[in-house]
Amino acid sequence: MTEWRLKLFGCVVVLAIVFFLHVTLLRFSQTVYHGALETIVCIGQVKKLDTNESVDQIATFQILSSRFRGQTVEVDNIWIGRDYSDRKLYIGDRLFLEIPLRRSDQKSIDTVRLLEYFRTPYLLYLTGLLAVLMIIIGGSKGIRAIATMFLSGLIVFYLLIPLLVKGYNPIFVSLSISALLTLMTFVVIAGFSRKVISGVIGTLGGLIMVAVLSIIGQRAMYLTGLAEEFGFLELGIALWRTPGAHSWNFTDLLSAGMILGSVGAMMDVGMSISSSVHEVKEVNPNVSVRQAIRIGFNVGRDVMGTMADTLIFAYLGAEIITMLLPRIDFPEVGVSYPFLRIVNDEATAAAILQAIIGTIGLVMTVPITSVVAGILTKYAKVDRDRVAQDIPSTEELEMMHRQEEEKKSQYLVPFGLVVVICSILGLQNYVNHSAATVVRKEDSSGKLVSVSEYAKGKVIRRLERNAETESTVHDILEIELLAGIYKGQNLILRNVIQKKMPLLTIPAEPGDIVLCRVGGSPDQIGLVNLVQEYGRDRFLIWMFGVMLVVIILVGRNEGVRTVIAMVGSGLIIYFFMLPLIAGGNPPVLIVVLSSGMIAFCSLVFVIGPSRKTFSAVISTMAGVTIAGLIVVISQHYLHFSGMENAISADIVEAVGIPFDFRQLLLAGMLIGLLGVAVDGAIEVSSAMEEVRRANPQMSSWQLISSGMNVGTDILGTMVNTLLFAYIGVRILLLMAIIAPDLRNSLFASPVVELLSIGITAAEILRLLAGTLGLVLVIPITAIISAFWHRRS
């Protein structure tokens, strides 16, 4: 079958599947039991609205599914004055409706309860659009990428999650499944070839590194694995209290989530390097093993910084509201969530640790993959009849490399290492003696009257352990305060250890650093003080330092610039983006401006001003713009409020509505898209430059073809990067949904309705929009890079 016929056939199949699922969804109805009460969940559409009432709406719904299909019913859409729960309906809106049945043979509708918006069809249309674009752009490779996603989903939902639910060792299971997914993805996308071998070996090496570091991290920071929320539900605590989850090892499940969250990024790096080395060998058989290894390192150094951004921005985008909390002064209680408290909170610390060790793992994937891919080129068979005759020889390629190396500074790497080590030591000393004011009260003359603050303290000794029961232990601790206005003073604090609720327990031992909440007058400490959190930021700083050192050692000069660019990106976010958003400026506009600054910093500064970097910057902004348009248009159909979580509700209840939460949600999605767009663009443009260097006689169209070869090779693995990043973060949620007894007790809703819940639909949209932007970035980058090289 020719390529265009294959594309046509694939598009027809996708459209047929979308149409079938669309019809099936519109007929959805399911019986749900609430105790002895039988109800039917079905679909209804708003046909008429009565807005005469100022306090609520009277909506007339037509039932679209179930045995009541075609009937109409009036529903009072009650507003209670809370923006995070009230919703304004419009004619044409479709919602899930719950109809109670007083009798099993009931023919008419007595009462109806409004449930979630019916968001699933629109998400289905976006999924179909993504699949069609992947087929049109990628052809057979696009079809294989779709098949890979489908098979990955089957393995995750029908093998990985059931094994975890049954209580098998999470770390062993996640490593085994990750190895299987890696092998399957590479074989399906690239077939049985040598580049598959190098990619798989490199990915597995990085995964083992992540597994080891995750175990060390969760033990060093006393992570319980229970700090997960789903909307307004404290999911981790709910699962801990549910008998069906008593066999689960939550700490190891946290490590399993970190492994799964990193596997996509490592597959992408491994495939990018393997594909680039293979492509270079195809266009120039004179490339030696040593030169092939060097080419792998060149591509890996170009992409490792942007891949790190992909992981980091994926997590930052989902936590944008949390990042704003330190800038909110709550009435009467002050700054309840200073940065010092948030960074030591388990949920935040676990997310930061996941981003750090994921970055270390993918950086270590670079040397492993490069060495294996280079060695395997020794056994590659190239058809020299298809290669131009006037290509550079091995000696000429070596001379080109020496000329490039002579231009590089020999002192940048050791200087960078010294600066990083000194900075980490200084930062450690600073955080160990840091404090954060919550409330500060002064009299009319400006004299300090009272203060409440978070401050670091060191546990000197345990004075007494008393009132021990089956569920609690009371420790009397002597703690020396290391910071704040009471610095140097010793406190006697009671630390309650709850044996049956580890998330609410701070296991402080003599010598540990803890975060304390203290208060009182300047002359005397008050009586009510407590141990707030375990001091987790110290270990995070050490791991951050290890990450920077590894980046420099592997990336050399490019690694030093990568570190500087990462720090620069962090400064842009902390000192530019967050203050402007907190000041009430439009979040989407601020994020777009910040994205441009970060893309420029990450590409032009790290790699240097060149054709490939400017091509990547232009392509990145095009991808972010397209994805942003998709997100903004989708908001109109999906009716997100941006307040589908407990943090937003707390902010609204305390200070009203200081932000446009809808725009905040969309802005968070754009942040998550940025890393993917940058990474996809630089991987394609970097590989095309290596191909052009190996064979300068290639025409622009041949260069575009090579760029598309690399781009479509990484398409499936880049999609997996986002997919597995979200799976890793939501591993407990997936287990709770798939385990039948848990789903019925925690989520008394059909799966189709769960997919339409605002927080779930937002995560799905984040994934789809990012993937759509990535798919379009590949041809844009290939075309711009090819014709830019031609003009040179």
List the predicted regions and their residue ranges.
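Extended, hydrophilic extramembrane loops/domains of integral membrane proteins
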Residues: 81-122, 500-539
